[in-house]
Amino acid sequence: MKQTIKYKLNPKREQEGHLHNICSIATKLYNTDNYQRRKVWEETGKIPSVYTQKKLLKDNVWFKLLPSQTAQEVSFTLQRNYNSWFKLRKKDNTANPPMFRKKEMLSPITFYQQFKIINNQIKLSVSRKYKEEKGIKSLEIGFDLWREDKGIAKMCQIIFNKGEWFAHVVYEIA
């Protein structure tokens, strides 16, 4: 059984800057990926798979600035959006493909294996390139309402909503 718990994060100013930066990078990667998919769609009438896109994007600066699984999740999200568009298009031929995200939008970032929860802190890994550019090893962010014995943390999604940061953590409960 799985359970999702939402934590309100309390990042320090520097940590908030890094979170903002990483979420902005995810938005830029989403838009780059979307641009390439649309280009292929216009040329061939087909959308490339997530794995084809990964090969095309592996040298992209935005792809390298995110942890690998986080960057892949951005592509999977876009793929799900395109799959939804294809289903809708069968019913309504005027349906539009997924839109580009606005520059100022902060995309959610998802971590699977690159995070740890210790007491009332979430430790998030960053990519090698981000470490080199920003000089940090990881982000350790405090949060409210720590409850122990929830099970094994499997996934963490960081979301910015109405001026506040939240972590949605999915636990596997035995």
Where are the regions that the model predicts?
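Nucleic-acid substrate recognition interfaces
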Residues: M1-A174
